[in-house]
Amino acid sequence: TVMAASLTACGSGSTATTAAPTETNADTSAAASEAASEAAGSSDADVQKIIDRGVLKVGCKSDVPNFSLQNTATGEYEGFEDDLAYEIAGEIFGCSADEAKEKKLVEFQGVTAKTRGPLLENGEIDLVIATFTITEERKETYNFSTPYYTDAVGLLVNNDSGIESIEDLNGKIIGVAQSSTTKDGFTSYVEEQKLDVKPEFQEFDGYPALAQTLATKQIDCFSVDRAILSGYVNDSNHILPDRFCEQEYGVASAKENTGLADLVDKKVT
């Protein structure tokens, strides 16, 4: 069983879609299928479909250090969330996470906050493990596992910006990821705290673009979950002490795939 960690996020990643190699020889696929059947007994139809296919398809980020980052040299996805994908694949195919990785039983596809939902809904991927914040609204569309990470949204600013707190952001430009929950979380927080802070928001397609735009001072602040921001801290910027919109990440599956959802939840819990 994978212990639930203390991590979460509001934002999205890049649009890279390079997938790990998925070809396996017939012997490997047959062995994996047999081992999975022995381990799981009579599998649910949605899980059996993955076993028969011979690979678990997972949507992940490609630009979030520590969570999921695509190695530009090897094309491999590396990080906590990718390791979790191998743990789940091991459960499905009746092997260890290391064996699942060695046998390439996970096919990764890079997703963003904007693309991860549609890819899951149209069946191109089986799971989303991509800093996907659990909300009541999203639970109406997807199955979510027990949370595996909890965090709060943060604010990254340049050292020479003169911005020292959220109150200094009135009239400033805040960059956020497309389809993230950051903007709504920020707005709700300042209303709750009765702060007179009305910034302008600009949406971007990925975190590297946000970091670059902050560095070139085209925006005044880069806002997303603090754990994600930590991967973009350097000598010229810092994260403000303010934190808001605490949230939880979960593994998402299509609403109809209840067997897969149950298997994932048991593994994550």
Question: Residues of each region from the PLM?
Answer:
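Extended ligand-binding regions for polar small-molecule ligands
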Residues: 26, 35, 39-41, 83-84, ...
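Hydrophobic residues within well-ordered alpha-helices
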Residues: 88, 120-121, 169, 213-215, ...
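Acidic, polar ligand-binding/catalytic clefts
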Residues: 86, 98-168, 236-243
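A ligand-binding cleft/hinge motif common to bilobed small-molecule-binding domains
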Residues: 115, 129-141, 185-189, 212-246
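Extracytoplasmic small-molecule ligand-binding "clamshell" domains
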Residues: 40-44, 48-128
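Bacterial lipoprotein signal-peptidase II cleavage site
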Residues: 7-19
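Periplasmic-binding protein-like
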Residues: 62, 149-160, 226-268
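Bilobed "Venus flytrap"/periplasmic-binding protein-like clamshell domains
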Residues: 60, 64-65, 77-95, 133, ...
